């Protein structure tokens, strides 16, 4: 009899250990068309409140007990995806979402519910993607990220046609600007008319107007965290544009398919060349040359060793060229 009780107790203890075992589901969420990681994608279990969001590298992780689950992944602008799985051990689940176009018949604007700005954890954070910035009306054909930020609440320009911003009354030198975690000290071209950020190379922008994370310091007003695109990991791609005063070209290519990629994006103004050519063709001395032009280049190489380790090298090079000659006047 005692032996039966001991055996029963052992079986109950073993069953509790088996059914109480916890395992981890983790992986990356990517764009199915080009392999770009999706930041802030929602990953949760269907029919429950258990879930998480992807971090700045598109990575997510969920710790669950063993059993059957339906994992749901959603992201704005992409089709919803559901995956059924049986969890019996640590599992790697990489998810690819297909972009989706949604046509809206009308737009309804409503006020936020009462006290929503108090209970929200991110009430001082604004997020913009390159697609959103592209939709904003541009100056002389040039999409400008800083000009877009100036349209947000609590942000204003520091001067007419200036790429500097003042956040909640602070000075332009009180803003911390980061490009792939590297500090940008001078963010303007052409005397402040244009910013140094080429939107074709930017993935997303986060503006912290308050409640700045503790790992960032040295500024009083705001944090502007800019992330560059990783590049297309599936196929070679390119895009470009011609504006009134400048042209730009972006090239993306996989180094190793679905493992590594590289992106190059450059632009240059040519108003100086156009005016010089017009002066030469017309033969008139009344046309004054434009003594200013700028060019810049963004580059990034990215390689993923495995789901937990990746390395990237990003860089920016820009130059403003100003030349002016003073002729002699005979009196």
Segments predicted by a language model, with ranges:
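Short, acidic, small-residue-rich periplasmic hinge/interaction motif at the N-terminus
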Residues: 30-33, 41-46, 72-78, 88-137, ...
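Transmembrane beta-barrel wall of Gram-negative outer-membrane proteins
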Residues: 243-268, 284-321
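Structural motif
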Residues: 21, 27-38
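A short, amphipathic beta-strand motif
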Residues: 25-31, 58-60, 95
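Short, acidic Ser/Thr/Gly-rich low-complexity loop/linker segments typical of extracellular
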Residues: 48-59
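Periplasmic N-terminal accessory/gating domains of Gram-negative outer-membrane beta-barrel systems
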Residues: 110-212, 229-230
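Outer-membrane beta-barrel translocator domains and adjoining extracellular loop/strand segments
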Residues: 275-281, 315-318, 323-330
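Membrane-embedded beta-strand positions in outer-membrane beta-barrel channels/transporters
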Residues: 94, 106, 146, 164, ...
């Amino acid at each position: 009899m005692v032996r039966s009780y001991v055996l029963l107790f052992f079986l109950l203890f073993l069953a509790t250990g088996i059914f109480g075992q916890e395992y981890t589901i983790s992986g990356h969420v990517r764009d199915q068309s080009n392999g770009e990681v999706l930041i802030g994608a929602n990953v949760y279990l269907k029919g429950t409140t258990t879930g998480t969001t992807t971090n700045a590298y598109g990575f997510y992780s969920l710790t669950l007990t063993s059993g059957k689950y339906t994992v749901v992944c959603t992201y704005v602008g992409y089709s919803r995806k559901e995956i059924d799985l049986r969890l019996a051990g640590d599992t790697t689940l990489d998810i690819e979402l297909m972009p989706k176009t949604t046509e809206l018949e009308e737009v309804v604007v409503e006020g936020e519910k009462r006290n929503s700005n108090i209970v929200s954890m991110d009430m001082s954070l604004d997020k913009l993607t390159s697609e959103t910035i592209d939709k904003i009306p541009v100056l002389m054909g040039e999409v400008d990220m800083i000009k877009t930020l100036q349209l947000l609440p609590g942000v204003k320009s520091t001067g007419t046609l200036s790429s500097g911003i003042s956040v909640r009354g602070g000075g332009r030198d009180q803003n911390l600007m980061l490009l792939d975690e590297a500090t940008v000290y001078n963010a303007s071209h052409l005397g402040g008319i244009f910013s140094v950020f080429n939107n074709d190379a930017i993935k997303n922008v986060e503006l912290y107007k308050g409640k700045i994370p503790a790992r960032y310091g040295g500024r009083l007003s705001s944090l502007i965290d800019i992330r560059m695109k990783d590049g297309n990991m599936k196929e070679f791609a390119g895009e470009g544009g011609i504006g009134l005063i400048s042209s730009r070209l972006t090239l993306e290519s996989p180094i190793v398919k679905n493992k590594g990629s590289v992106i190059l994006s450059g632009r240059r103004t040519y108003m100086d060349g156009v005016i010089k050519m017009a002066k030469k063709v017309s033969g008139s001395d009344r046309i004054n040359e434009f003594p200013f032009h700028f060019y810049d280049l963004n580059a990034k190489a990215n390689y993923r060793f495995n789901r937990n380790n990746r390395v990237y090298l990003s860089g920016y090079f820009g130059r403003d060229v100003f030349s002016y000659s003073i002729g002699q006047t005979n009196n």
